UniProtKB/Swiss-Prot annotation:
It holds the Pfam family SepF. This is Cell division protein SepF. Cell division protein that is part of the divisome complex and is recruited early to the Z-ring. Probably stimulates Z-ring formation, perhaps through the cross-linking of FtsZ protofilaments. Its function overlaps with FtsA. It is found in: Cytoplasm. The lineage of its organism: Bacteria, Bacillati, Cyanobacteriota, Cyanophyceae, Synechococcales.
Amino acid sequence: MSLISRLRAVVAGDDYLDGELDDFAYEDEQQDQDQRATQADGGALATLGDSNPFDLGGDLPGSNVIGMPGISTAAAEVNLMEPRSFDEMPRAIQALRERKTVILNLTMMEPDQAQRAVDFVAGGTFAIDGHQERVGESIFLFAPSCVTVTNASQDETSAPTVVSREIDVAEPSESASAPSPAWGAAAL
C-alpha cells in the first residue's frame, strides 16, 4: 500500500488501513520481546554489558547536544591591540564576543579618545559579564566571562579611593560634639 493510500485511509476514517498490520509496529514489538527475554535471563547486568556508559568512541544516535560557538578545548587566544583611533574599538568587542581576551595598549591614542575607547570596551565587557583590569599606564586587559583574571599584586598596588573632607584637628572638642541645629541654638 502506498503512502498516499495510507493517508487517504487515515483521513477518511477507515479503521486504520482496514485491518492491515503495520509492519513497523510489528518490528517494535519483536524488539521489546527480545529485550524482555534478555533481562529475564541475565537480569539488569546483561543490559549493562552491552553498552559502556563511559565509551566516548562514537556519537550517540539522536543526541541533542550541540557545541557552543567560540568554545574550544584548544589554548585560549589573546588579542593585543594598539589602536590609533576609536574606529578600531568594534574589533575589540567582536573579539570579546568570540570569547577571546583583549589587551588594549592605548599609548598611541589621544587621552580623550583613549578614555572614550576604554569606556566603550568596558561597557561591552560588562554586557557579556566579562572582567576588566588595568595592567599599566594606558594598558588594559578585557576578558570574557569564561576567563578568570587574578591579580596577585592587587593588594600592594591599588587601594580603594576614599573621599573625605578635611577636618581641622586643632579643635578636637568640636569634632566630638554634635553640630548645632540649622535654626540656631540661640532661639531656644
